[in-house]
Amino acid sequence: MRRLLGVRTGVARVIHSILLEWQRLPIPFDEVRLLTPRPLPAGLIPPHPKFREVVVGPDVPGLLWEQLVLPARVRDLDVLLAPSDTMPMLAPWKRVVMMYAYSPEMAASFPWSARVRWEPFARNAARNGDAIIVSSRNILETLEQGLEVQVPRERVHYAPLAADARFHPRPPGDPELADALERYGVAGAPYILFVGKLSRRRHIPELLTAFREVSAEVPHRLLLAGPNLLQLDIDGLIAELGLQGRALYRGFVPDGDVPLLYAGADLFVLASEGEGFSLTTLEAMQSGVPVITLDRPNMIEVTEGAAHLVPDGRAETLAGALRTVLGDAGLHADLRRRGLERTSALTWSAMAQRSLDVLWSVATGN
């Protein structure tokens, strides 16, 4: 549960959604222990008769806690759910690992030092986990390519992710929506949205340049939201492109505001060379927002014909896509409709039930 202690981005939101859904499902286990290096935030996980929070100290950096502290301090488990790509290499219990996409393109976007620290543990999990849960076959293939490992197929289980119920269309007069748009500086005009970590593979400079190319043709603003882990000079680039007041970078957005920013957007753009079963794309579609993304296997699988796909993340390509979608009301409405249809087929309830079934099967040997 370490991921729930910090900023709740992708994996933390997956864990949180699964735990909330488990509370609504029949749990075959006598007890579900939430192992954490320090107490979870108050109220994050509602009380449940089978849930028990267990603080396992000392609180040391992530992989050290997972690899050394957990195996030394925790003994009497039937099965461990490791929710984020790695698991304790030496442990007395069975282990189920949730793994996400890690393509060669994604690998190249991370610092070499981080890859050296992380990849051996992920490779071990892929080879030796008692069961591996992934969102799709394409995710599995990209994971194998990025880690240069073959995952035993008999241990693989598929469980697609979903957007949670907080993400939905809202009427223009919604007071919560109006307040959020005012606070983030996008009230009074339509806007294009990007949500996610700012990384090399997501073509943020190219998106800004593309927006400059079309900014005289549309009334929209561009809103970028997400942690700037690479320390890109976004404000400097915005100034260089002459987009002050039209392009806005808001950094990390509190979890409660994210659904509102989606609901108010006129278009969502994720021009990424490597993604998993993209939660941000699902959240945008479920909010009734048309999506532009790259024509890559994982994104094709996630969107299933419900997004406007482009071949690359060059500025001229993205500018053309912006003109196409924003300039064609019929296409815009059709993408909105198809996105809502696609996400209606994906639920956290199904994903949570599948993960519970896998855990029970591994624990009991059935």
Model regions and ranges:
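Carbohydrate transferase catalytic cores enriched for Leloir-type hexosyltransferases
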Residues: 1-366
